[in-house]
């Protein structure tokens, strides 16, 4: 075996430029594959991270407007959700709906504590289920509870960012104190963690308190609920169709009018995201494998050239008793050595590149003015995947070396000795 490697080393060093170019194509193939997979993972991790911020099996219903005349009423009529719609949701769909709530908002509010104040705050009237559906992280205190709701208490839950504005020196100590909102005194009952998004800077008060302060009547704003028993996209579509028809009928709109309400179904959105991330991963693997193919072709070509140049040598070997297997083994081992060595270099450089991406743009965020979200998180590839890609390249390189190796093994000594 030592003699084989010594002979391979002599052959490689004798054709340095050709070996270097072939090795570059192998290393480049592995490098590009790992970088592509890392970038894809960064995008997928960003999507998954944002998805985890809400309860998957939940829906939010928004009022819209009619798009067609019905029952003597014209199109373009606004649909405002109300208490009857909440009752219908709770009672008419009890087989699937768990916890029903609603949300009303009032923007541009000023909150004051002592000499500090913060402006342009969105105050939301919510039900207790809001914390579960939107997965808010409480740092201290509690969220709005049923007692707050029933007694219309002036309780308020702040984000950490708002608390820092009102009490910069010790924001968490604001819990349990009185602040002013809408010129009324509210007791801070909880402070939740801010995740840098606009939505996380809202202040929350009981839904019933909001109604009484802002005279909202029987309007509910958005209806929010969790559900169970809807496990496929088809089941969710059937539920949405039935729900829309019942709500439309209640508002004297056509049952098939899809613009009367907008349903944000986080479950179907989650299914679509899973499909999208799967397609992204598959597409990146396909592109990466085609890049690997260029390296494999390079290995095959250099082996064919090697066989052609050494035809006379192989003929002499066979004439003095060398077996076809020994020649076959020589070519295959040379192919494996080239792909292994340069494949390893490509793998190391690829890992280094993904680590650099992670250090520089691994926490990239997008901000559209309404919210900010991380879109590129941890763009790295596991060592297992890197090794698998390299092993795949080595196996492919071995197969690529088989064609010229078989050609070399079949050379007849007389024909080989006649070769130039």
Positions of predicted regions on the chain:
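A short amphipathic helical element positioned immediately N-terminal to and/or at the very start
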Residues: 1-13, 85, 89-90
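Short juxtamembrane loops and helix-capping segments at transmembrane helix boundaries
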Residues: 51-52, 352-387
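Transmembrane alpha-helical interface segments in multi-pass membrane proteins
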Residues: 6-9, 13, 17-25, 32-40, ...
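Peri-transmembrane interface segments
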Residues: 47, 237, 254-288
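Short cytosolic juxtamembrane segments of multi-pass membrane proteins
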Residues: 2-3, 405-420
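Hydrophobic, regular-secondary-structure patches
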Residues: 41-122, 129-132, 212, 234, ...
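Mid-to-C-terminal secondary-structure elements
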Residues: 129-144, 152-253
